[in-house]
């Protein structure tokens, strides 16, 4: 039973690492001014052409 517990803990730890690394790349892209995800200072609302931003930001294209 203890062995099964250890396997579950290790499996969840290994699976969670790649998702953390993927979000770091998105953060870098959002900070890049040339990216579609970058916010501009227009009218207090940013410009974002990424599909996830759709309801909150205008694309401006």
UniProtKB/Swiss-Prot annotation:
Residue numbers of Cysteine amide PTMs: 59
Superkingdom per UniProt: Eukaryota
InterPro entries in alphabetical order: Conotoxin_a-typ, Conotoxin_a-typ_CS
Alphabetically ordered keywords of this record: Acetylcholine receptor inhibiting toxin, Amidation, Disulfide bond, Hydroxylation, Ion channel impairing toxin, Neurotoxin, Postsynaptic neurotoxin, Secreted, Signal, Toxin
Residues the record lists as 4-hydroxyproline modifications: 55
Region feature Disordered, mapped onto this chain: 19-46
Biased composition (Basic and acidic residues): 21-42
Keyword Isomerase: no
GO molecular-function terms, A-Z: acetylcholine receptor inhibitor activity; ion channel regulator activity; toxin activity
Secretion signal, residue range per the UniProt entry: 1-16
Subcellular location: Secreted
Removed propeptide positions: 17-43
Positions of disulphide bridges: 48-53, 49-59
Gene Ontology cellular-component annotations: extracellular region; host cell postsynaptic membrane
Tissues/organs with expression: Expressed by the venom duct.
Annotated family: Belongs to the conotoxin A superfamily.
Free-text note on domains in this protein's UniProt record: The cysteine framework is I (CC-C-C). Alpha3/5 pattern.
Function comment: Alpha-conotoxins act on postsynaptic membranes, they bind to the nicotinic acetylcholine receptors (nAChR) and thus inhibit them.
Name listed for the protein in its UniProt record: Alpha-conotoxin-like Sm1.1
Biological source species: Conus stercusmuscarum
Lineage, broadest ranks: Eukaryota, Metazoa, Spiralia, Lophotrochozoa, Mollusca
